[in-house]
């Protein structure tokens, strides 16, 4: 399995992102040295794509496949792309507060901690649908790891499109998110322009 191993703060600095979007409380003490440099139109489009890939932990080939799928769906391609990325199971676990970061959520899914509608899911790219019930397996709920995670991440604000029961470590997808409910600082229209060339 290919994983991006670039240091988080270094990558956040280069993309102009706040580490809090990824679930990190760290802050960079360095100044942006290239902040005043003029960026071309292609450079802006590429940066937006890299931001989205980095935030959601998706590599180039799956990201391109998500774009193709979003392009074939009805509606706006950019909005469809963001909805697909938000509905990945690793992102949903992060949003529900069952993981501190998306990387940790991915690992929790990989290690078979998660069930969707009563069935174990161990594929981080699994896409949830409206009405799906996501739960941490009974055998994993009382582990020290899950207790530590819930203690730290449990206070996170859950988006409107999700419903969570923190006691049972269970969440429900009420509906797929709209663009207003997605708080990721990405301009998806620039990504659409990049791929439509």
Curated annotation (Swiss-Prot):
Q: What is this protein called?
A: Small ribosomal subunit protein uS4
Function of the molecule: One of the primary rRNA binding proteins, it binds directly to 16S rRNA where it nucleates assembly of the body of the 30S subunit. With S5 and S12 plays an important role in translational accuracy.
**CDD domains (alphabetical):** S4 (cd00165)
Record NCBIfam families: PRK05327.1, rpsD_bact
Q: Which residues form the S4 RNA-binding domain?
A: 87-147
Molecular function per GO? rRNA binding; structural constituent of ribosome
Q: Which Gene3D superfamilies does the record cross-reference, listed alphabetically?
A: Ribosomal Protein S4 Delta 41, Chain A, domain 1, RNA-binding S4 domain
GO annotations of cellular component type: small ribosomal subunit
PROSITE patterns according to UniProt: RIBOSOMAL_S4, S4
What is said about its interaction partners and assembly? Part of the 30S ribosomal subunit. Contacts protein S5. The interaction surface between S4 and S5 is involved in control of translational fidelity.
Q: Which InterPro entries match?
A: Ribosomal_uS4, Ribosomal_uS4_bac-type, Ribosomal_uS4_CS, Ribosomal_uS4_N, S4_RNA-bd, S4_RNA-bd_sf
Give the family, as the similarity comment puts it: Belongs to the universal ribosomal protein uS4 family.
Question: Which key words tag this protein in UniProt?
Answer: Ribonucleoprotein, Ribosomal protein, RNA-binding, rRNA-binding
Chain's gene name: rpsD
* GO BP of this protein: ribosomal small subunit biogenesis; translation
């Amino acid at each position: 399995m290919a994983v991006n191993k670039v240091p988080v703060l270094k990558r956040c600095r280069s993309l102009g992102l706040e580490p809090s979007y990824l679930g990190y409380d760290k802050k960079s003490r360095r100044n942006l040295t290239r902040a005043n440099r003029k960026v071309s139109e292609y450079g802006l489009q590429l940066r937006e794509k890299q931001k989205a890939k980095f935030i959601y932990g998706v590599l180039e080939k799956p990201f391109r496949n998500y774009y193709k799928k979003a392009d074939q769906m009805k509606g706006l391609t950019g909005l469809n792309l963001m909805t697909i990325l938000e509905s990945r199971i690793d992102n949903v676990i992060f949003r529900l507060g069952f993981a501190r970061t998306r990387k940790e959520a991915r690992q929790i899914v990989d290690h078979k901690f998660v069930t969707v509608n009563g069935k174990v899911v161990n594929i981080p790219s699994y896409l949830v649908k409206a009405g799906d019930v996501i739960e941490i397996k009974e055998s994993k709920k009382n582990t020290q790891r899950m207790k530590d995670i819930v203690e730290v991440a449990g206070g996170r604000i859950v988006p409107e499109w999700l419903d969570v029961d923190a006691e049972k470590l269970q969440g429900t997808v009420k509906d797929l998110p709209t663009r207003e409910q997605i708080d990721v600082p990405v301009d998806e229209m620039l990504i659409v322009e990049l791929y439509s060339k």
